[in-house]
Amino acid sequence: MSPHDRIVACFAPSGTLRAAINLGNPILAGSDPSTGAARGVSVDLARELGRRLGVAVELVTVDNAAKSVDAVVHGRADIGFFAVDPLRGADIAFTAPYVLIEGCYLVHEGSPLRSNDEVDRPGRVVVVGRGSAYDLHLSRELKHASIVRAPTSPAVVDTFVAQRADVAAGVRQQLEADAARIGALRLLGERFMVIRQAMGLAKTRGSEGAESLERFVDDMKTSGFVAAALSRHGIRGALVAPRREDAT
């Protein structure tokens, strides 16, 4: 078996590259309003990887990050697009990140909260998207505030408003869009985390596939593919991640 055939067998043992696409992260993917088809940066990357491998691509769409992780870990998808997190890293081999986005807090206009330092206090309620990178992060970091989990990231702000919670946590762009849609809401000034978006596959697929995916992501960054995809899909505020120093 040639090196190329070994890589194809690693990524697409069925002959089709199945890519888990999380429609709950609008920075990476969404549904075309006219056709309903998935589109976005992650879709473009999946199709480009399939083109290079010479195989068809099947998009396995899900509505939150936890389902995307589950699909890859349990073999219902071959690759996925995830925020890097040590808990997920137990089962998934991540590449270096290709995009960096900000995790921020949103509050009601009349809230007394003015800074991130005021969030983690007894009695505060913070709404997050179940299984998201910021859910995992805040579950470790918040020691006093309570966490309420909305079913998906796009549902966070509506849940926050309906429950009259103190804080909504999420991706800056999603929070800004929801604040404009609903009104009388504002973001706290600073981010509470940088979310590193990477590609990944199950560790059970072996090191050769992980190394090949790492090279693919590095090429997508350095060639300008990721930057062009962000621009093409009108994504603002997300940054192309720097190249890893040890990338070759």
Predicted features along the sequence, with ranges:
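Extracytoplasmic small-molecule ligand-binding "clamshell" domains
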Residues: 1-83, 88, 149, 220-223, ...
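Ligand-binding clefts/hinges and TM-proximal coupling segments of bilobed small-molecule sensing domains
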Residues: 1-9, 133-150, 187, 218-248
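Short loop->beta-strand "edge-of-pocket" segments that line small-molecule binding or catalytic clefts
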Residues: 16-23, 39, 117-134, 146-147
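Periplasmic-binding protein-like
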Residues: 23, 100-110, 172, 176-218, ...
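Ligand-binding cleft/hinge of the Venus flytrap
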Residues: 29-34, 46-56, 95, 120-122, ...
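Hydrophobic residues within well-ordered alpha-helices
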Residues: 49, 72-73, 119, 159-162, ...
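A ligand-binding cleft/hinge motif common to bilobed small-molecule-binding domains
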Residues: 66, 82-91, 137-138, 158-193
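Flexible hinge/capping segments at coil-to-helix
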Residues: 98, 107-126
